[in-house]
Amino acid sequence: MAQAGVVGEVTQVLCAAGGALELPELRRRLRMGLSADALERLLRQRGRFVVAVRAGGAAAAPERVVLAASPLRLCRAHQGSKPGCVGLCAQLHLCRFMVYGACKFLRAGKNCRNSHSLTTEHNLSVLRTHGVDHLSYNELCQLLFQNDPWLLPEICQHYNKGDGPHGSCAFQKQCIKLHICQYFLQGECKFGTSCKRSHDFSNSENLEKLEKLGMSSDLVSRLPTIYRNAHDIKNKSSAPSRVPPLFVPQGTSERKDSSGSVSPNTLSQEEGDQICLYHIRKSCSFQDKCHRVHFHLPYRWQFLDRGKWEDLDNMELIEEAYCNPKIERILCSESASTFHSHCLNFNAMTYGATQARRLSTASSVTKPPHFILTTDWIWYWSDEFGSWQEYGRQGTVHPVTTVSSSDVEKAYLAYCTPGSDGQAATLKFQAGKHNYELDFKAFVQKNLVYGTTKKVCRRPKYVSPQDVTTMQTCNTKFPGPKSIPDYWDSSALPDPGFQKITLSSSSEEYQKVWNLFNRTLPFYFVQKIERVQNLALWEVYQWQKGQMQKQNGGKAVDERQLFHGTSAIFVDAICQQNFDWRVCGVHGTSYGKGSYFARDAAYSHHYSKSDTQTHTMFLARVLVGEFVRGNASFVRPPAKEGWSNAFYDSCVNSVSDPSIFVIFEKHQVYPEYVIQYTTSSKPSVTPSILLALGSLFSSRQ
């Protein structure tokens, strides 16, 4: 089944089930029998699904719930006695009251000026564009209710504050908004049945307001679920979520809201929307197993066509225009063979009547300096003449800001990180004698004395296809001294690439590795130990070590040698590109979604998969840093208590006696040794075997 068809079936199953299902139940109900991995890859479909973590009942573990999401809305300009939309929008022309259950005008014996049909040419075109033309009317209404905020009556915020039967609401019973507990609707009310706020849509006060809108009794009974779904979708789609997503948050798909600001979730989505840096350098060892996008440029422009993302033509010209903050929209075509052009709106990220998106490589501030073809984001502010000024740039008529684009980008990424608090939403800086605050939510900078605001813009630095070719062929080196270990073979340092050096069983280096392995696996026989020499990975690891040491006030970083079991088919890919838990297999997720490393080889042996009696295991060098007990829902270490932007470095199974470490940032790991061992066919007696037997017997005396 084509992917668009599978996406359509998942959407239909969810909408038929009330808009959301637990992940295992969703998989069970699908007709095509998707594997768990295939379903999770499918759920990365941008804008089609949201995965939320909801607390289980009583002592039950948290549950991953999949929700049907969509940018589809009712056209507000079409509503009312004088519909004002001429049909150029990408939204449904449908009577709002019909969606509620029954048109109040028809019930009163009057004519309704709004459309009551989904089969008009306009509506059918909109449904096909959004890939939902196969849904039934009820399924479509469910999708609209939990995604279109205009359809849901507003909850009175004043009612949810203060004491008294109506909280602090001055209108009391005359209030046109619903008086109901907002925390109940979010699934977060800790008071339950003892809550002083109403949890009932059917009480006389709320029911009267809902019936005036024409809501059916069936719809009223479903409102708690609808509001809960809408809350989770909004929380995931328009703000840095405090509920960890299903996938690790590092994607860089560019999506914007109507104000022109980048939605924070664009930095917190899965890496499946991120272009693979190794593929651009023609060196991705994971190949078709890589979870990132493989493309020949560090950017990719696409539009949504019938639920599937398609490439736009002339991406280089689009990218060049987008990199200019003065340009808000351009005309472009979807392919060279078509004569039809549509407007690509950079602020709204729309292409004609449908959605558009920009995929890109990782932000340059998240990678070491020598990584090529990362995305350099430039931050601008609009001056009093409407000209865009780059942060930190000298040589202009304006005072130089005390923060650069790089500083702003780092702060913005911290704000977009799941778990960041409200303090991370702003960045204070100076320019001349004035103090300012940059607000990442509103995308404005504010003068803290006069209160004046200026627009803020974030655009990438342009990289042409010729620039890509040049950077691919140039031998970019790390700007700093090489510090390879003195025991490495300096004649075996391919750059790029790696080489494995087989260690002599009589060497001290071999014995150190063997002793660590033998401590918990004394009856397993080591066939070979190889040292991995990858100059690029080693330099990245040393750079990461330096960064962590700076953040630690100059103190040494806790560095350990830990084991990681894997399948032999992934060994070369790991040696080339480091560990990636999405590709190399999951070692459980009890303490977070990351790469698992163990103090004991016996633990890692359980994950050393092999069809023969020969197994493979890594002994890695790991920067564990400061750690905290992990949790299955973590997609990165949590923030330190009392800090807004300071996070732990790793998660463990026990803080007092850790034996399992979860690493979320692969630069904290270097795959130092590959151990090949067997569970049978005892080899001839060697000094290492005698040493093993001697240590074993002495430990039993």
Swiss-Prot record:
Residues 259-268 have a biased composition (Polar residues). It is found in: Nucleus; Golgi apparatus, trans-Golgi network; Cytoplasm, Stress granule. A zinc finger (C3H1-type) spans 94-119, 150-179, 180-202, 270-297, 271-296. GO terms for molecular function: NAD+ poly-ADP-ribosyltransferase activity; NAD+-protein mono-ADP-ribosyltransferase activity; NAD+-protein-aspartate ADP-ribosyltransferase activity; NAD+-protein-cysteine ADP-ribosyltransferase activity; nucleotidyltransferase activity; RNA binding; zinc ion binding. It catalyses: L-aspartyl-[protein] + NAD(+) = 4-O-(ADP-D-ribosyl)-L-aspartyl-[protein] + nicotinamide; L-cysteinyl-[protein] + NAD(+) = S-(ADP-D-ribosyl)-L-cysteinyl-[protein] + nicotinamide + H(+). It holds the Pfam family WWE. Belongs to the ARTD/PARP family. PANTHER family: POLY [ADP-RIBOSE] POLYMERASE, PROTEIN MONO-ADP-RIBOSYLTRANSFERASE PARP12. This is Protein mono-ADP-ribosyltransferase PARP12. It comes from Homo sapiens.
